[in-house]
Amino acid sequence: MKKQMHPDYHPVVFQDASTGKSFLTRSTVTSERTVEWEDGGTYPLLVVDVTSDSHPFWTGAQRVMDTAGRVEKFERRYGKRKAL
């Protein structure tokens, strides 16, 4: 097998931005931010918007997403069109 064909696969901590829950897993993604884990090791930290700890499919809870602001911003920028 050729060397340098596959990216570096290493331990990484993903943290849910809304719940604060952290998950130690392996990934090819890198980050400048680091965090000290429970085992005493220091790992790259990536903060993500949604994980299994906050996604409605996994939690069974429905949460209202704030999309009204996005729609209004789109309509202001591009104008509201008339229905056909």
From Swiss-Prot:
Alphabetized UniProt keyword annotations? Ribonucleoprotein, Ribosomal protein
**Per its record, what are the GO molecular function terms?**
structural constituent of ribosome
Q: Cite a single GO BP annotation.
A: translation
A GO cellular component annotation in the UniProt record: ribonucleoprotein complex
Q: Does the keyword Ribonucleoprotein apply?
A: yes
Q: Which domain of life is it from?
A: Bacteria
Task: Output the InterPro entries linked to this UniProt entry.
Answer: Ribosomal_bL28/bL31-like_sf, Ribosomal_bL31, Ribosomal_bL31_B, Ribosomal_bL31_sf
State the PROSITE patterns in the record.
RIBOSOMAL_L31 (PS01143)
The record's similarity note reads: Belongs to the bacterial ribosomal protein bL31 family. Type B subfamily.
Assembly notes? Part of the 50S ribosomal subunit.
> Can you name this protein?
Large ribosomal subunit protein bL31B
